[in-house]
Amino acid sequence: MSTLLIPQDTIAHTFDEAVASESNLRIDEVPENYLERFIHPSEPENFEFYSLRDSDIPSKRIPKNGIQVFENLKYHTNSKDNLYKDQPSSGPSPMRGVANIIREYFPQYLDDLRTWCRPKSSDDSIFNDFNHEQRITQPFTEERERRLLPLIDHFLGIKPYDIVHYCDTRFYPWKLSTRADYFHNHSRDRKAHAAKSHPDFATGPTKKSYFINSHLFFDRSTVHNIKEYGFPFRPTTDSARNETLLDLWFKKVPTELLVRSHISKRDNLKVRPVYNAPMIYIRIECMLFYPLLAQARKRDCCIMYGLETIRGGMNELERISNAFNSFLLIDWSRFDHLAPFTISNFFFKKWLPTKILIDHGYAQISNYHDHVHSFSAQAQSHGIPMISKEYQTPPEATVFAKKVLNLISFLERWYRDMVFVTPDGFAYRRTHAGVPSGILMTQFIDSFVNLTILLDGLIEFGFTDEEIKQLLVFIMGDDNVIFTPWTLLKLIEFFDWFAKYTLDRFGMVINISKSAVTSIRRKIEVLGYTNNYGFPTRSISKLVGQLAYPERHVTDADMCMRAIGFAYASCAQSETFHALCKKVFQYYFAKTSINERLILKGRKAELPGMFFAYPDVSEHIRLDHFPSLSEVRILLSKFQGYLKETPFGTIPTFSTPQTLRDQTQ
């Protein structure tokens, strides 16, 4: 039986009513017209989720082949175009304090202020980035699947695991400060419930923290229905009606496209959507994948957790690369838009069932007594008895397998049938490809697709399994670097063929000019950094732009943290830029009136992107002061070791585990 180790400090007041009501929670019968009544052919202010559209779709919102538009549906708008109508397309001016410091002390960076910008967001730019043509791809043959599965296991190193119970997903380190999904922000029932049940730490009436208790309370019934019936409601005896109801359910729980403005050169403005996925979708993902994500941190997994630049990862890659002859770096174009459903279906239906154990029930948390005491105390305060389930007999394997299979099948169906809503209220569905960026498993599924396409190409080219296993593969989403024992000529021959094969077979586009086939270690590039004998380097010009043009409104304290973050992000490669960061830190710190430690505490969100995939950052890096140049150099000069599965979880192995695939074959 798998055991999850739950950090004590993750227990918060996020379960309130859901915990107290655990013993008397019931699943109500869904009324006959329950889902149909969410369509309101009335004025916009009167409809709940969507209304019927009374005008044609404008030509600039007509999608390309492979994307379905719901012409008759009108959703709520979240457009910010009017707020920025007087702004130039290049966006706002640089931070005044940073710009003044550069003019007075660092005039060599003035050109960088003119080169870079944070472009103005717009509804058109969001739709244009989403709107990419898709094409049908054929599934793998059974013979190819049989070769791919053991090779994928070789490189991912994921062992079979128990899934997590709905209640225990609360201990995943959720980020609750971001905007809640479309459904919660427009559901009258959820808003009314959240008004009374939101926790004290809620940061606003549109945030996940405001709706967390309402979500946990109501969606447990929905998840129960999915496990029992494969639908988020109790199905009728009419299968056609069930499909209609399910389609309506997907439409009322859409994924909202929010705006993210990327640092850009003024002749190539980049505004991208951020996919605000439904909270219940992410909750189901956590049930199925929490232990998997813990294992992805291990050394024998090819996903590059633990090799972060800030932890000396480039130094480790330099050391390893000495044993190899050639290196391949593939730069994918529009990866998240073009990743075919063929491979995501392969992930859900073929690979995932081989990794989920079904003979021990749900994973048990190792410090069970501490948590069950907390739950019981909360239940008692509500006057509701709560019976401990510590010694509950695990469900029969066949029964549990059906529940797990229903969860996987539903999630895979929703992944394909997800409805996307633009800021100006138009709704679309992808039909052949795409990985939404706002789900829990985005990075893992991207990595899986990346690895699978590579392995399929190696097989198709004619390499044997043993030759393929000689490679050392490092992947993070759509980024990759492959170390090979082959001659440079042999690797070039493969890559030239592979670029055409991926386009013909999967519709995936490789950016040839940004990819690299080399035998020179100093050309190895990982996550935006280039190797320089073990020290990472990158464009200082772009860092100047990022420092001067923050993505969102920032306070003086935020700018202090940003200055620290960019000092680390520059990796001590420029004394001048480090001095700029220090000046910026001193300028904004002087404008605050609180203790430095209080200013910096809890402001990790303002760190640059290199820190985002690194939840353990505070354990290895001091963020309570501005670092010296030597501090940064010392930090990067030595690899700090591979990550462990904790604090996410501890997953033991089994001698003869029974997986979901064994039960369903």
UniProtKB/Swiss-Prot annotation:
Catalytic activity: RNA(n) + a ribonucleoside 5'-triphosphate = RNA(n+1) + diphosphate
Keyword vocabulary terms for this entry: Nucleotide-binding, Nucleotidyltransferase, RNA-directed RNA polymerase, Transferase, Viral RNA replication
SUPFAM superfamilies referenced in this protein's UniProt entry, alphabetically: DNA/RNA polymerases (SSF56672)
Cystine bridges: none
EC number: 2.7.7.48
One matching Pfam family: RdRP_1
Transferase recorded as keyword: yes
One biological process term in Gene Ontology: DNA-templated transcription
Entry keyword annotation includes Transit peptide: no
Molecular function as annotated in GO: nucleotide binding; RNA binding; RNA-directed RNA polymerase activity
Job of this protein: RNA-dependent RNA polymerase which replicates the viral genome.
Protein name: RNA-directed RNA polymerase
